Amino acid sequence: MKIVIAGAGSVGRYMAKQLAASGHTIVVIDNDPSAVSRLQNTDTITSLQGDACEVDVLTAAGAADADVVAAVTGDDEDNLVISLLSKQEFGVPRVVARVNNPNNEWMYNEMWGVDVSVSTPHLLTGLVEEAVTEGSLVRLLSFDHGKSGLAEVTLADGSPAINQTIGSLQLPREATVVAVIRDGHVVVPA
């Protein structure tokens, strides 16, 4: 896959290296020459200095034939503009955008060209909740702009659901159990 990453900070550089190691072709764009210079061009990673909010820079990066654009700068407004241009001007099939300020999370939707938003503050809050709670529900991920999600439920000692079959539990109709962790082993329900 060809992936264009807007933002060569620590997040963008890490993503570029990991995705390139998985066999993807990566183009990284950043306005800051020092950020671009920290990324070495290889057979699978190309770096480009420029403003990813500009159509001509996205054109030079090959956004028109990208499978994914990831807008991961440290600026929410830039990430939204990059997402909108990627989707509207270039028809990129999948646009992922980083949310820096949780107050801006509501804007990261299809109207702005965002297919998947990643909110670091939101994810960290979920991880902290998971670390400090027991016998409760922790939201892990949100899909389709909050219409559905993935949650982890930890059963407290003495819960009536312990040792029951999934079929015998009275779960909401819209809920699906995708995995059970029992004694450290993952069990996928049939």
Could you describe each region identified by the protein language model?
Residues 1-190:
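Cytosolic regulatory regions of ion transport systems
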